[in-house]
């Protein structure tokens, strides 16, 4: 058998990487991954998985960076890349804080971008960072879509509707139907009040160079 050229990337146990969209980086999160809802449950159970790790891997060099280290009771969510910077979400359940860090691509300058207090009933369900620009959102189990930062607002969405991404003052959602055949519909809502402005068969796909394609 021909020798296969396989390059080893030492990640200290993190075995799955995802593309950091818009950049040449990949990232990986261990244990509960990016699910901060599950992370909160682990914290409340005093589980042995009392924190997680977030790494970045450069391409094509394959250099591994671990720019931030979580303490007990702290968990990272999915990072996003926007305007040449990396944004990292961390939930600090000990102090009931949500912290967003920002970093350059070389991880030479990392600082707190914003720090928010967790609400009393915060369950971190579907809590995540999105772009463009960087926005902290969550969708509750009762189909209430909420923006937590930079501007707080909330509105109801359809049970089959899910948030995809933001384009400046527009919020892009997708909704699926089975009537009886499966199909999808793209929906554009206005930021921040959520008024539905447009809907069309298909879905909106963002290319690497920032083009928006209606596919379907």
Question: Where in the sequence are the language-model features?
Answer:
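Surface-exposed loop/turn elements that mediate protein-protein interactions on large endomembrane-trafficking
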Residues: 1-17, 36-70, 93-122, 133-163, ...
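Short, low-complexity, intrinsically disordered N-terminal segments
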Residues: 13-27
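Short coil/turn segments that connect the beta-strands within blades of beta-propeller domains
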Residues: 22-25, 83-84, 131-134, 168-170, ...
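Blade-loop segments of beta-propeller domains
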Residues: 61-87
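Conserved beta-strand position repeated across blades of beta-propeller domains
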Residues: 18-20, 80, 128, 164-165
């Amino acid at each position: 058998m021909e020798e296969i050229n396989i390059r080893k990337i030492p990640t200290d146990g993190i075995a799955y990487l995802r593309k950091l969209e818009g950049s040449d980086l990949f990232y990986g999160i261990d244990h509960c991954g990016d699910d901060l809802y599950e992370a909160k449950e682990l914290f409340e159970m005093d589980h042995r998985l009392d924190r997680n790790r977030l790494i970045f891997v450069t391409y094509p060099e394959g250099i591994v960076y671990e720019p931030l280290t979580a303490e007990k009771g702290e968990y990272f969510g999915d990072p996003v890349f926007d305007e040449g910077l990396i944004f990292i979400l961390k939930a600090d359940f000990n102090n009931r804080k949500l912290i967003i860090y920002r970093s350059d691509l070389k991880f030479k300058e990392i600082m707190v971008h914003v720090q928010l207090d967790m609400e009393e009933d915060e369950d971190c369900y579907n809590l995540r960072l999105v772009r463009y620009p960087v926005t902290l959102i969550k969708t509750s189990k009762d189909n209430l879509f909420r923006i937590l930062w930079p501007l707080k607002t909330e509105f109801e969405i359809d049970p089959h509707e899910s948030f995809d991404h933001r384009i400046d003052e527009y919020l892009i959602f997708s909704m699926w139907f089975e009537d009886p055949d499966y199909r999808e519909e793209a929906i554009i809502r206005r930021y921040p009040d959520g008024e539905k402005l447009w809907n069309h068969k298909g879905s909106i796909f963002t290319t690497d160079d920032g083009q928006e394609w209606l596919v379907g």
